[in-house]
Amino acid sequence: MPSAELVGVLHVHTRFSDGTATPAELVSLAADMGLDFLGINDHRNLKAREAGWAGRHSGVVVLAGSELNDPTRANHILVYGADTIPPVTDSAGQLATVASSGGLAIVAHPCETGARLPKMGPYPWNRGVLPGIDGVEVWNYMSDWKTGATLRDLRRRVADPDAFVGGPHPGAVDLWLETGGCAVGGVDAHGL
């Protein structure tokens, strides 16, 4: 069976939630970079999908999904392939709804510790292994970058972001090994 390597980016946000770019701008950038796929995960909505962005655009396969959370704003789930957004309930209920609609559910940034900056708190996964988890985001660029960030070192982090990231969190890898399914890395980009 022939195999091919596909290169893409998962876990990006658009203006349909808290991102700064439009889906068109992100798809254009992805095409310019030679990416094969782009995973859009706007918070608690499917507006990118409803606006027709799911499918192939400019040679890039766009996975127009969502990012869910529980009532505590923690326990985030990346969702692809679901036709509806479940109500804000506990994670188990959301996972069951996604599974029943034929969607794919990936635990997002499970070991995030956050930064010591406004609006950059942690959004970890604290629910353990639950039925309906199809995979784990074992590495999240934004979560890794913002870990321990302070106003004092923010300028250095912006000037050289890669110096502040290290790769998959061991706890996230452990969760993936417990749950099975796919292991993914995401950028969690909110701007261009």
Regions found by a protein language model. Give the residues of each.
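A metal-dependent hydrolase metal-coordination microenvironment
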Residues: M1-G132, E137-G191
